[in-house]
Amino acid sequence: MRSTRNSFACLCIMLFGMLFVPFTLRAEEVGEYIAIRKEGASRIAVVLDKTSADGGKQREWARSLDVTINKGLDFTGLFNLLPAPLNIRNGQNGGLNFASIASVGGDIYAGGSVTKRSGRPVLEMHVYDSSGKSLLARTYTGEESQLRAIGLRFCADLVELLTGKRSVFGTRIVFVANRTGNKEIYMCDFDGENVVQLTNSRSISLTPAVSPDGTYIAWTDYTSGKPNLYIKNIATGAKVSVNKHGVCISPAWRPGTNTLVTTLSYEGDQDLYLIRADGTVERRLTKGGGIDVSPTFSPDGSKMAFVSTRQGGPQIFIQDMNSGQVRRLTYSGIYNTQPSWSPNGDKILYSSMQKSGEINIFSINVDGSGLLQLTSGSGNNEHPSWSPDGSMIVFSSTRDGRRRLYVMNADGSNQRPLLNMQGEQQQPSWSVSK
């Protein structure tokens, strides 16, 4: 058992540290070009040149980097990627022909080269606008095994340059899958790559939640025959159990703290309780009657949305964490569950069953206005979770016959599968990497 715990700890340390690649600035960014794209604007047309390289190993690195950068930028939904025209370079001096960038409809140009220094890949990238003004020039380096992370580091820098946000690069998604025959917890990169199994309970593991700082992971486990909540320190592997009599389900971490909220029933009703990371109960939060589950927090941790049956069928309510005052948020739909509070703090996602029996994902402003249906006519769509930057949503859907994970933009556009994996996947939770 000790060997298993140690292996899990080492694996998690490796996973959460993988994307932190050292890089050096080659030149400063041009400040006035930060956040040139506003939300809701059309895609930015990027002429993306192939990475140049000399030597067999460097050309191999260049091909790998090109794939990573193309896929990474395309995944965001922010860009219209254009191949570099044949006349991109001036014949005499080999410089860039900026007129050709505009001629193919490009807004900006991105390209660079990879060299080898002390056996390590060194990627030098440049970004220009169509007039030839330099927007970014940076050098990235790391081990050969970190080529994917090197390419994604550039993608993150480009997105931040143009939008002011870091986007989803470097984030991870935890979820439940049954490809082994049992429901276990898995983790993958933001784009579905590098899937790793985190639990091996050979039973049922559900509702994974990673703490806001990436230190802990909590989940519900049925190995003992009843639902127990486990909290694990990812770095050390230390694990504690919240082993209370009765129900112990649906954990959610409170931002800015090492505490989480979960549903317990050891005092009678199924209510929400504040739990410390060591597994001890700090206090009871809800006493409204009925069943209270599925908590989610505002970014500052001052308010909590949750599902309650206190007024009949399950609906979304919001509670002030200081005063304890509770108000109902949702009134449309006969069965509203699985809320997820946006990182911007202004919206809440949730799953809603309509009278037709179909389950779809909706977005609503925290004041109850602005109800927007994001999915329709494509099976049951559930378990929405915001990306840490608020630009995307991961969810589960049966549109292809079995439960699989999908992603979409925050406005519901560009819905597509996240990963190709045997069995079914559900209950995704998008998280940061420590």
Swiss-Prot record:
One of its GO terms (cellular component) is periplasmic space. Residues 413-434 are annotated as: Disordered. Its main location: periplasm. Residues 1-27 form the signal peptide. InterPro entries: 6-blade_b-propeller_TolB-like, PD40, Tol-Pal_TolB. Keywords: Periplasm, Signal. PANTHER family: PROTEIN TOLB, PROTEIN TOLB HOMOLOG. Belongs to the TolB family. This is Protein TolB homolog.
